[in-house]
Design a protein with these regions (language model features):
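Bacterial N-terminal signal peptides that target proteins for export
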Residues: 3-17
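C-terminal motif of bacterial Sec signal peptides marking the signal peptidase cleavage site
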Residues: 27-28
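Active-site nucleophile/metal-coordination loop of metallo-enzymes that catalyze phosphate/sulfate
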Residues: 34-38, 50-131
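Metal-dependent active-site segment of extracytoplasmic phospho-/sulfohydrolases and closely related
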Residues: 43, 61, 215-255, 289
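Second-shell loop/turn segments in exported
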Residues: 48-53, 76-77, 110-117, 127-128, ...
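Substrate-binding rim/cap in mid-to-C-terminal beta-strand-loop elements of soluble/periplasmic
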Residues: 91, 254-296, 307
Length: 311
């Protein structure tokens, strides 16, 4: 074969193939042996919970987790400080320049992802955990339907969009509790679409916004109690997470009010009363979850496991 055009095309193809394989390779290290005694992770998301509102909030369950766990109110968003791109970074361990989700409501990459996993989506924490343990039981329930396009739903055992509706989040809480009790998933998430709505409707830190926080805390308390009833509590790490904060009635820009949000870890193997004193970005979440389970992470991820939270 001596056709220069064909030869150049083949060279480009093989160069791309080698790059793709390298990007989707995994990284392992001695520290990634998992946290002893942990069988479950329960991740609870509060869309739009701003870091600067937590101290004044009536949230006894979350504050008890902070007092007995590791926490920061200054976990930084990626830019823009909007929802889909930040939740994508939570799941995918990188920023939008790599996963490609770059707008508030992105359901697919706004420009091509730098790498794709076996299910045709940038590798998520659900992808990684399924590869680590093909028999793992995972669950994702969410009030905002865009999550279903961000999680790699082919790698999730069960996922469902449950709108807030008139139940004001009682429906998703009850469904999540039922799944926990019946299936005892190793990794699961319940993502509330609040207090983001109150922020947009009345303003971040407004009276209506602050009134919503104890309601959400009560749902979190119900979930914690459910893990006790299911016999999961003693070997569960809880994660409380948000995607962004807000200012006035919006977010998406570059103020710290919009970019800083809480991240809390509570459970066995987690330091107690530890204020995380290292920089944390939204995309550090997925590598930390992988670290807890001892799973290898894709080489393409750029976040890091927050080693400082572990005892």
């Amino acid at each position: 074969m001596n056709n220069p055009k064909i030869i150049n095309t083949m060279k480009r193809f093989f160069t791309f193939l080698v790059a793709a394989v390298a990007l989707c390779a995994v990284v392992s290290c001695d520290s990634q042996k998992g946290v002893p005694g942990v069988k479950h992770i329960v991740m609870i998301g509060l869309d739009g919970l701003a870091g600067n509102t937590v101290e004044a909030a009536d949230m006894p369950t979350v504050k008890q987790m902070m007092a007995e766990g590791a926490w920061t109110l200054q976990a930084r968003s990626i830019l823009p400080s909007s929802s889909a791109c930040n939740w994508a970074s939570v799941y995918m361990g990188v920023g939008p320049e790599m996963h490609g989700y770059n707008t508030w409501g992105s359901r697919k990459p706004d420009f091509p992802s730098i790498a794709l996993g076996e299910n045709g989506i940038f590798p998520t924490i659900f992808t990684v955990l399924r590869q680590h343990n093909p028999e793992i039981n995972t669950c994702a329930l969410y009030e905002w339907d865009v999550h279903g396009d961000l999680i790699d739903n082919k790698a999730v055992s069960y996922h469902k969009h449950i709108p807030m509706g008139e139940s004001r989040s009682a429906d998703i809480t009850n469904a999540y509790i039922a799944y926990l009790k019946e299936h005892k998933p190793q990794f699961s998430e319940c993502i509330f679409d609040s207090p983001d709505g109150e922020g947009h409707g009345y303003g971040w830190g407004s009276e209506e916004y602050m009134k919503r926080l104890p309601e959400l805390d009560a749902f979190i308390s119900q979930i914690v109690e459910a893990t006790k009833e299911a016999g999961m509590y003693d070997d569960t790490i809880f994660i409380i997470i948000s995607d962004h904060g807000g200012i006035n009635r919006g977010h998406g820009s570059i103020t710290m009010d919009e970019m800083e949000a809480p991240l809390v870890f509570f459970g066995p193997g987690i330091k107690k009363g530890y204020k995380i004193d290292v920089p944390v970005v939204r995309y550090d979440t997925a590598p930390t979850i992988a670290r807890i389970f001892g799973a290898d992470v894709p080489a393409v991820w750029r976040g890091r496991a927050i080693e400082e939270i572990f005892e």
